[in-house]
């Protein structure tokens, strides 16, 4: 919710009719309730709901990558200090995420790879 409020600049301005604790619950509620609005990741939007156009721009992977669809945020991985100063396990994880196999996993779970 924090990212939604921050990106739309509506923090402390929303009166939520109902707060749900899972993506599936949000999709089901929005699909069943005329006029409902919910927020979920792009990869789970299905034909039961419609993704919001923002300033006339469709919510697509290409538009997100191009910076045209601004209602998105990156996932980040962080360490205390440089990756090269971390344990071998942590370094192995970062190397995997950047590898072709890691990118395949990222795409497989519906996330958008950075350019």
PLM segments and residue spans:
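Exported/periplasmic ABC-transporter solute-binding proteins
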Residues: 1-115
């Amino acid at each position: 919710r924090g990212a939604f409020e921050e990106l739309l600049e509506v923090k402390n301005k929303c009166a939520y009719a109902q707060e749900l604790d899972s993506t599936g619950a949000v999709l089901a509620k929005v699909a069943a309730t005329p006029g409902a609005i919910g927020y979920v990741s792009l990869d789970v939007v299905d034909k039961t709901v419609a993704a919001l156009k923002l300033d006339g721009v469709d919510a697509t992977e290409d538009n997100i990558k191009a910076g045209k669809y601004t209602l998105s945020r990156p996932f980040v991985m962080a360490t205390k200090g440089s990756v090269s100063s971390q344990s071998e396990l942590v370094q192995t994880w970062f190397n995997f995420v950047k590898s072709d196999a890691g990118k395949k996993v990222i795409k497989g779970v519906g996330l958008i790879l950075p350019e």
